[in-house]
């Protein structure tokens, strides 16, 4: 559900806990902070359909900013802080951002971008530099009540650019008043985490990956929308992750194969040091997981490991649980959103066992397009 419901409903229950610092944002604070952000964006003249970009480390205000943009009907783009300044500049300009938010942690990057982002409202968390105003100071001037014209925004994340310039994955903005009924809400991956992974308001979700990636951003948003609690690691560390599972009684988590590998390379004393009994669902994706690595993880954690295959476009979703994987080792599961086709360069189906390009069949490819690139959109949705 929406922060406007969860705030009054769950009040002082933690929505976000930063595992390293211990900083907490409650559901009511998430509601109020996102209202203040939305009020700020409207005061700057941003209207539904406009764009905002933000680049920061795993920061406690990452999701209050994302929810503020969502409540404002904006397209919001989270950018990797590991990119070069020229790459960041390209994305900010390509997405048409009218607001750019970063943090003091990335001060050097901010300084190098200041002159190239003329005409863009620039804000910084935890301090100021050059042409960047304090985001916290600005929102503190704003009311904590909702803006009058709330409507549903959408994330517009950029692909990795492995086949050229990064491409923004865009979806249409729904200009209708924002729904406050759970069955109408389409916030993040709420339905996925609820339906496929049995998440609810009592879930406690561990997020160890960079938040600017589509999966951590979407899954955290989904859990928060249910009224759950997200425990966010500032950065991944094998022992710190295990300690967090014990300390916060984690029920759900999400990983990538390199994290599994780093777990398994750790001292056995560390692996057996922590109580992991609360852990019910461990989700992984992002890259192929070596069979022997997954076998060892299931031996260690038990049959709680779930895998999926999808993309930022979310035009397809394939998933399997541990039992299904053990009976078909190497699989990523069955499609949940329609048939899959493996085609050759001439768009012909290839026989089982042969390589080809993966195509998901579905209604208008789930409504996505590549921002400013009709040809690539046409090529990806034929």
What are these regions (language model features)?
Residues 155-157, 161, 225, 250-255, ...:
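Gly/Ser/Thr-rich phosphate-binding loop
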Residues 178-208, 212-252, 266:
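Conserved AMP-binding/adenylation subdomain of ANL enzymes
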Residues 2-26, 127:
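AMP-dependent adenylate-forming
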Residues 20, 108-157, 165, 171-190, ...:
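ANL superfamily adenylate-forming
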Residues 15-59, 84-89:
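Conserved AMP-binding/adenylate-forming core of the ANL superfamily
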Residues 335, 348-380:
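Conserved ATP/PPi-binding loop(s) of AMP-dependent carboxylate-activating enzymes
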């Amino acid at each position: 559900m929406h922060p406007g419901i969860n705030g009054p409903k769950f009040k002082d229950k933690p929505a976000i806990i930063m595992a390293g610092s211990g900083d907490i944002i409650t559901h009511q604070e998430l509601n109020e902070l996102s209202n203040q952000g939305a009020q700020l964006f409207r005061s700057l003249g941003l209207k539904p359909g406009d764009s905002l970009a933000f680049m920061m480390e795993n920061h406690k205000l990452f999701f209050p900013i994302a929810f503020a943009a969502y409540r404002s009907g904006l397209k919001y783009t989270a950018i990797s802080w590991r990119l070069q300044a020229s790459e960041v500049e390209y994305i900010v300009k390509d997405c048409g951002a009218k607001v750019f938010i970063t943090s003091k942690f990335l001060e050097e990057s901010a300084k190098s971008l200041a002159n190239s982002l003329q005409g863009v409202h620039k804000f910084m968390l935890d301090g100021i530099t050059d042409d960047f105003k304090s985001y916290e100071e600005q929102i503190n001037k704003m009311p904590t009540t909702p803006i009058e014209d709330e409507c549903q925004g959408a994330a517009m994340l950029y692909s990795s650019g492995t086949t050229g310039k990064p491409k923004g994955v865009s979806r249409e903005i729904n200009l209708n008043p924002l729904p406050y009924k759970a069955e109408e809400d389409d916030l993040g991956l709420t339905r996925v985490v609820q339906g496929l992974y049995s998440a609810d308001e009592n879930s406690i979700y561990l997020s160890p990956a960079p938040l600017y990636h589509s999966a951590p951003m979407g899954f955290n948003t989904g859990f928060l929308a249910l009224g759950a609690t997200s425990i966010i690691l500032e950065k991944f560390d094998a022992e710190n992750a295990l300690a967090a599972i014990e300390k916060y009684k984690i029920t759900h988590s999400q990983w990538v194969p390199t994290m599994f590998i780093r777990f398994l390379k750790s001292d056995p004393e560390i692996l057996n040091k922590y109580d992991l009994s609360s852990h019910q669902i461990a989700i992984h994706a992002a890259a192929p997981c070596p069979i022997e690595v997954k076998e060892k993880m299931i031996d260690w954690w038990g049959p709680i490991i779930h895998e999926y295959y999808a993309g930022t476009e979310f035009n397809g979703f394939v998933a399997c649980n541990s039992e299904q994987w053990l009976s078909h080792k190497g699989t990523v599961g069955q499609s949940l959103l329609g048939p899959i086709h493996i085609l050759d360069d001439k768009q012909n189906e290839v026989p089982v066992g042969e390589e080809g390009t993966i195509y998901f069949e579905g209604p208008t490819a789930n409504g996505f397009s590549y921002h400013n690139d009709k040809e690539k959109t046409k090529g990806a949705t034929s």
